[in-house]
Amino acid sequence: MEFSVKSGSPEKQRSACIVVGVFEPRRLSPIAEQLDKISDGYISALLRRGELEGKPGQTLLLHHVPNVLSERILLIGCGKERELDERQYKQVIQKTINTLNDTGSMEAVCFLTELHVKGRNNYWKVRQAVETAKETLYSFDQLKTNKSEPRRPLRKMVFNVPTRRELTSGERAILHGLAIAAGIKAAKDLGNMPPNICNAAYLASQARQLADSYSKNVITRVIGEQQMKELGMHSYLAVGQGSQNESLMSVIEYKGNASEDARPIVLVGKGLTFDSGGISIKPSEGMDEMKYDMCGAAAVYGVMRMVAELQLPINVIGVLAGCENMPGGRAYRPGDVLTTMSGQTVEVLNTDAEGRLVLCDVLTYVERFEPEAVIDVATLTGACVIALGHHITGLMANHNPLAHELIAASEQSGDRAWRLPLGDEYQEQLESNFADMANIGGRPGGAITAGCFLSRFTRKYNWAHLDIAGTAWRSGKAKGATGRPVALLAQFLLNRAGFNGEE
């Protein structure tokens, strides 16, 4: 689908369709008022007859409106004008895309980007419109034999901006929006792929393909079990012992700043391509969704794709920590004591708390890059789902400025996170009689104690942890990966690169 921006009057648009908003109760938006004036009150007369109230999601498609060059006008309800916030704006865009697609409009000029959204500028409105449009049109049908396609799918969308001054920021918004949307799609595709296809080797192949596509400044190295053993990554290796699929760690290095002083930002993604729970096996109900336990790695892959596509002037390293947690004769057990790459020992009390055992060794491994900051992304704890539900990602950090940056990026992008504490009191729950620490700390504050566990391996750099257990996928009828927190991390890196979306 093609996107562009222009600045022009609605009555002069030669297009298959013009999209304008109507507020509740039956109040025309400024652009709709212009069209109504040109058409001698044609639109307001329809509203007076009760054809459209302006409630969110309502639509009315008009054909051959007098004195308007466009073939059709799509009126879309935007709710009450004062209540139009970012969430409602995205819903309106989503409804617009679905309606245009369902009614066979192959192209349209959208004036919704001229609506006032509280606290948001032109760049944000255009970028979010692009991201929302791509999200709305997403489907995962690679493995279906019968693929359904719209009769005449929407191919071109033009976003109108108030004046020519906004064209540059609008074009930049489209560029950024498309790159972020492509990263989200890549993350969703990886997450939705079944575990018999998407194993650690598959993750590694995707990482290698990324380097092939952006060979100018992307290098991928894949570290297998033998090399991990030589590095002393015994905790990581233990988790994958029960699986016939080899554990593989894929390291994607993007260099956008050649300066010797430019330290990288490192992103670490948990890549459990299937988590049965191991010997501490999970209940069978819902276990199919444990293919989503690699959504952290999928998100990191999507972000690296976005960074490479935009050629950001920063250095970023993405690590996909791929493995599979299965029961078996070689599987690790409750009661085992593991020696991590850092030299610290861990008593395993539950083999289903495996993500932290993989991540702790990767967090030690990345010390060699002397990072500016390290952010790990993981579907780590069910406790985070209980704490924050399915709408907000959990955030923990050992560095306040980094945490504040991530919270700001989450607000800018609409991919929200909430900070949880990392207090010494919680560390006490990880005490073990037989090792330096246990891998679980009991039910109270489970998301926090998981973060506390990881914090013991991050003392040499600024670090943040994103627990996406509640936000990485949806269940039920809408089952599928969400691609979060690609948008959050993309905004964080855009801000670091100097593109903060301010006009």
Curated annotation (Swiss-Prot):
Reactions catalysed: Release of an N-terminal amino acid, Xaa-|-Yaa-, in which Xaa is preferably Leu, but may be other amino acids including Pro although not Arg or Lys, and Yaa may be Pro. Amino acid amides and methyl esters are also readily hydrolyzed, but rates on arylamides are exceedingly low; Release of an N-terminal amino acid, preferentially leucine, but not glutamic or aspartic acids
Top-level taxon: Bacteria
Cofactor(s) this protein requires: Mn(2+)
MF terms in GO: manganese ion binding; metalloaminopeptidase activity
Binding positions (Mn(2+) 2): K270, D275, D293, E354
GO CC annotation, single: cytoplasm
Keyword presence, Protein transport: no
Subcellular location: Cytoplasm
Its EC number(s): 3.4.11.1, 3.4.11.10
Enzyme active site: K282, R356
Keyword Transport tagged: no
Entry's Gene Ontology BP terms: proteolysis
UniProt cofactor note: Binds 2 manganese ions per subunit.
Binding site for Mn(2+) 1: D275, D352, E354
Family named by the database record: Belongs to the peptidase M17 family.
Protein name, UniProt field: Probable cytosol aminopeptidase
